[in-house]
Amino acid sequence: MKRYLMPLVLTASLALAAPAAAATPTLDKKTIAMMDDITAVFEYSALTPQYGNIENDNDGCGWTAGWIGFCTATGDMLDLVEHYNGVKPGNVLEKYTPTLRKLADAGSDSVKELGTKFPADWKAAAKDSVFTQLQIKIGHEMYLNPALAMAGKIGVKTNLGVENLFDTGLMMGPGAGDCDGMPKIVKETTAAAGGTPATGKDEKAWFKTYNQIRIKHMKKPCTPGREHDWPDAVDRVQALQKLYDDGKQDLRAPLTIAGGWNLTITDPRD
């Protein structure tokens, strides 16, 4: 489920005392699909993205739906639906756009305004390949692209390193202004480690420190309301750390996600 409640900032800018940024990592389609499937495991205990899932977790997000948990309270669901309207006018979700905008502007987690038919209409939209492809595209623009930009900035070379940054941004925020977000954790890790992979620090050791700092943020978050659910989700970080411990930096299938899931991804696909 989506847990990021601060306004979306799609830049991963961060001032670091480092030399010129390394090249942004290039991911092949199978690796990207694997990252999407890891998200499906973490979010829904599923092996592939769950585009039609919609639920109210009473966690401050309002309706949480789609493969990454687009939320009515945060504005990312509004962004998705507006893109869908542009590509496919008259779609089943278009009529909800004004209400989605109102909820996003207010940061409201109310689910009443959208009416009782909204969940069914979301599920209907999820049967449309245009909508599911947009879910992937928008999700990557919001969270994977900032992770790749940050990876290039700090010299991350491995697929698992990018996955760590991607998952943190997706769960805790990709923006420099978020007090628990991915850039904040990168900054604290850089200080604790005395540098980044770009300055010669071992990437595996660097991410071990990164994951320890991320868990500290999850156990005692400064993001309002997250103290109720983030402490229970640290197994997500522990599962990523185990992939490091097992030498799975390339994220090649078959890949077993440990922790409370113990699910093996054998055929990565969106």
Residue ranges and their predicted role:
Residues M1-M6:
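Bacterial N-terminal signal peptides that target proteins for export
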Residues P7-A17:
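Bacterial N-terminal signal peptides
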Residues A17-A23:
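Boundary at the C-terminal end of the N-terminal hydrophobic targeting segment
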Residues A23-I154, L160-D270:
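Cell-wall polysaccharide-cleaving catalytic domain and substrate-binding groove, primarily
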